[in-house]
From Swiss-Prot:
Biased composition (Basic and acidic residues): 1-10, 212-227
Subcellular location per the Swiss-Prot or TrEMBL entry: Nucleus
DNA-binding region: 56-68
PROSITE patterns (UniProt xref): PPC
The PPC domain, residue ranges: 80-230
Protein name per UniProt: AT-hook motif nuclear-localized protein 17
Organism, scientific name: Arabidopsis thaliana (Mouse-ear cress)
Length: 276
């Protein structure tokens, strides 16, 4: 066949070449085949003793072109503020103290009442006199809130060793005739209209017993040194008597009387002079 004839002719042609040149020709053919399929860094000798260097290309992208290391991403979260303001609205006919107390228990927070506005009715206050400690007095009628001061502490955790602290609620009220009353609330504080309370919440209060043990030791040492000094004369008995009389005169309060809230006698308001 035609193809077989050409192959035979080529074989005869290579057979006529010298043995050394035939080996170089075969090596050149093999290197050309390998360089066609695989690019590698090789040196191929030729007939005229020259060399051809084939450089192999590395696979993949060059370093630094892509997929650079990214800086770590830090997710920051805003912490809860230590105190948050609240505006509490108590409708008419509700106990203001109990409403705020339920709000604190539901939210598990402590609340410090800053101010309040509105009107309340039938207020029961505690007697401030030490002689009548534990007794209360009730004022009937409608009163306007002038100031409110209260603290509702959050329930302490079970593992806490802090002593329980009682909550307190104090008010200052203005009566219909301009009289001013106030004190610790000892009963329901029923709202006669819509009452607005401005408060601030707090969490995890820290308890400290004052004075500390170090301060007590320091004060005891200074007291012993002061006790060795001679007493100072100068009418101490007279000043003590004056202080005692002044304390008795100032200790009389409208809450120490044994009258009901409706029987309290208020001072008459000053009248304007008649025109001439």
């Amino acid at each position: 066949m035609k193809g077989e004839y050409r192959e035979q002719k080529s074989n005869e042609m290579f057979s006529k070449l010298p043995h050394h040149q035939q080996q170089q020709q075969q090596q050149q053919q093999q290197h050309s085949l390998t360089s066609h399929f695989h690019l590698s860094s090789t040196v191929t000798p030729t007939v005229d003793d020259s060399s051809i260097e084939v450089v192999r290309r590395p696979r993949g992208r060059p370093p630094g072109s892509k997929n650079k290391p990214k800086p770590p991403v830090f997710v920051t979260r805003d912490t809860d503020p230590p105190m948050s303001p609240y505006i509490l609205e108590v409708p008419s006919g509700n106990d203001v103290v109990e409403a705020i107390n339920r709000f604190c228990r539901r939210k598990s927070i402590g609340v410090c009442v800053l101010s309040g506005s509105g009107s309340v009715a039938n207020v029961t206050l505690r007697q401030p006199s030490p002689a009548a400690l534990g007794s209360t007095i009730t004022f009937h009628g409608k009163f306007d809130l002038l100031s409110v001061s209260a603290t509702f502490l959050p329930p302490p955790p079970r593992t806490s060793l802090s002593p329980p602290v009682s909550n307190f609620f104090t008010v200052s009220l203005a009566g219909p005739q301009g009289q001013i009353i106030g004190g610790f609330v000892a009963g329901p504080l029923i709202s006669a209209g819509t009452v607005y309370v401005i408060a601030a919440s707090f969490n995890n209060p820290s308890y400290h017993r004052l004075p500390a043990e170090e301060e007590q030791k320091h004060s005891a040492g200074t007291g012993e040194r002061e006790g060795q000094s001679p007493p100072v004369s100068g009418g101490g008995e007279e000043s003590g008597q004056m202080a005692g009389s002044g304390g008795e005169s100032c200790g009389v309060s409208m809450y120490s009387c044994h009258m009901g809230g409706s029987d309290v006698i208020w001072a008459p308001t000053a009248r304007a002079p008649p025109p001439y």
